Amino acid sequence: MTTSLQDGQSAASRAAARDSPLAAQVCGAAQGRGDAHDLAPAPWLHARALLPLPDGTRGCAADRRKKKDLDVPEMPSIPNPFPELCCSPFTSVLSADLFPKANSRKKQVIKVYSEDETSRALDVPSDITARDVCQLLILKNHYIDDHSWTLFEHLPHIGVERTIEDHELVIEVLSNWGIEEENKLYFRKNYAKYEFFKNPMYFFPEHMVSFATETNGEISPTQILQMFLSSSTYPEIHGFLHAKEQGKKSWKKIYFFLRRSGLYFSTKGTSKEPRHLQFFSEFGNSDIYVSLAGKKKHGAPTNYGFCFKPNKAGGPRDLKMLCAEEEQSRTCWVTAIRLLKYGMQLYQNYMHPYQGRSGCSSQSISPMRSISENSLVAMDFSGQKSRVIENPTEALSVAVEEGLAWRKKGCLRLGTHGSPTASSQSSATNMAIHRSQPWFHHKISRDEAQRLIIQQGLVDGVFLVRDSQSNPKTFVLSMSHGQKIKHFQIIPVEDDGEMFHTLDDGHTRFTDLIQLVEFYQLNKGVLPCKLKHYCARIAL
């Protein structure tokens, strides 16, 4: 009798295993642990009753008997096709292991604008940094990443903006905006963002820097930069600034001192004695902004304004407005305040641009060049047989020659339509070629050109080419040098019926603007420096 019961029990177990693979796995695991007697069903139970039923189904038989006694018509019950899965006590455990966990990182939609006011909406996590937002836009738009792409916070109601540092959390920046404020995030290049690490001599003039302790000999700008990053010693920035009085429209010229603890001004001339110094602003709970139209918006004496704004929503009353005499002075003040506020974090952003807090790490970011692009080699097809060019200098010269040949073919193609003269052919070719270049900005004014260059950083060699407003058939090269913007007229010269472009009264001539720009990117010539970075308006 006992043997027959055990045989029936094992048969029922095998039937249950066939009906429910999950139950078979659980039972098999239990038998491996020696717990088979705890899970073994009684011999008089059906195979489908191996696993206990939920509490709601235990009294079904009693309810049916009560309904039968009361002559209540019974509704036909719908059988559960998988009672083992829904009734198993192990269901919650198995589900937790088999199904992926939900992502706990909250996401938020942000809108980012470009210089032409086109925008793009991004669904980003709450801990995304400014650098990661830039990286997303670079990848989505297939831009070249030269580490100069920057996210800007633009506050139009008070006419200021600032660079959002690469490590800052974008959602925290947005949380400080007022509900009715029409603030924007702008995405554009800023070549001057970390330029002070490369060329500190342009950012710290000798007459504006002093030291708390006496120093032996002269201190180089590189040593001054190292002092800003250290925690023991620090330089002191000082000079005259125009300050707007609180609650008034008037400005007052005062002597200021910038120290690690904050910004102070002297109540007695240029004296820096403690009894003559009065506190003006600190850095911890404030951000430094640059004024966009100080004269027009705030009645400033110059356009080189900057201000301190608390980390909260507010209007012009919360601003502490300052104004410098020249661009170099403003750049020195703003750079020193950034260094004192963020310290080594700025240097880490400069050295390790991809180390963000969110998911966009250096491993998840695709490189600038793909594997297939890196495997490309330079080839020369000028002879009867093609050959691989191994010398980089030769490869560059061949590429230049091919570019010139392509432009000559373009001239011939344009010359086949009708019978224009050589001069008209050259002008038509120029119109067809240079308008497609990102550095050409067509009919923009002198002020607009200066605004674009200032926005993208007053670094030596930042340039653009535009149409001349004074001479309709000529062009102008606008460039930055020494934190100043200079404009050079590109003069057309005709020789033997052919038109050329020149910057030096015809000593160096170019058939088109592309040749001119490429030449001055490699040679200084009559310019104060080589052309390095072009200003480009991008669309998102």
Curated annotation (Swiss-Prot):
Superkingdom, taxonomy of origin: Eukaryota
> Which keywords describe this protein according to UniProt?
Acetylation, Cytoplasm, Endosome, Membrane, Phosphoprotein, SH2 domain
Q: What is the first-listed, main subcellular location in coarse terms? A: cytoplasm
Ras-associating domain ranges (all copies) = 106-192
> Single Gene Ontology BP term?
signal transduction
Query: Can you supply one Gene Ontology CC term for this chain's record?
Result: intracellular membrane-bounded organelle
A Pfam family recorded for this sequence = SH2
> In what tissue types does this protein appear?
Expressed at high levels in the liver, kidney, pancreas, testis, ovary, heart and skeletal muscle.
Q: Which residues carry this modification: N-acetylthreonine?
A: 2
What positions are modified (Phosphoserine)? 372, 375
**Subcellular location(s) of the protein:** Cytoplasm; Endosome membrane
SH2 domain span: 439-535
Report how it sits in the membrane: Peripheral membrane protein
MF terms per GO, please? molecular adaptor activity; protein-macromolecule adaptor activity; receptor tyrosine kinase binding
State the SMART domains in the record.
PH, RA, SH2
PTM description:
Phosphorylated on serine residues. Phosphorylated on tyrosine residues by TEK/TIE2.
Q: Which PROSITE patterns does UniProt cross-reference here?
A: PH_DOMAIN, RA, SH2
Any notes on this protein's domains? The PH domain binds relatively non-specifically and with low affinity to several phosphoinositides, the best binder being PI(3,4,5)P3.
**Subunit:** Interacts with the cytoplasmic domain of the autophosphorylated insulin receptor (INSR), through the SH2 domain. Interacts with GRB14 (via BPS domain); this interaction protects the tyrosines in the activation loop on INSR from dephosphorylation. Binds to the ankyrin repeat region of TNKS2 via its N-terminus. Interacts with activated NRAS. Interacts (via SH2 domain) with TEK/TIE2 (tyrosine phosphorylated).
Q: What's the stated role of this polypeptide? A: Adapter protein which modulates coupling of cell surface receptor kinases with specific signaling pathways. Binds to, and suppresses signals from, the activated insulin receptor (INSR). Potent inhibitor of insulin-stimulated MAPK3 phosphorylation. Plays a critical role regulating PDPK1 membrane translocation in response to insulin stimulation and serves as an adapter protein to recruit PDPK1 to activated insulin receptor, thus promoting PKB/AKT1 phosphorylation and transduction of the insulin signal.
Q: Which family does it belong to?
A: Belongs to the GRB7/10/14 family.
User: Know the name of this protein?
Assistant: Growth factor receptor-bound protein 14
Which organism is the protein's source?
Answer: Homo sapiens (Human)
